[in-house]
Amino acid sequence: MTNATQHANENLTIHLKVKDYATWRSGYDGREKGRLSAGITNGRVFRNAQDPNDVVILQDVADVAKARAWLGSDHLKTEMQKNGVVGSPNVRFAAVA
């Protein structure tokens, strides 16, 4: 399996709590350009039926190193705080089995 093929099979799952879903969602949607530049695509957002401020995001990743760098950036951390993310998100990379 080539390196490119391996990267095409990577997924990113982020579980987070937010103060207000509508505020957070507006910020999330506004960061699409940043996600694309980090090789993160095809984002699907899910909300807990019992707690609409409990959010899970599932995304495809083309380049794990680029995605990790973007996720760890001070700019993104500031934006997440500004948009109401509570605490630290649970971030997991997984390969399609």
Where do the language-model regions lie?
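Short S/T/G/P-rich N-terminal loop/turn motif that feeds into the first structured element of a domain
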Residues: 1-79, 83-97
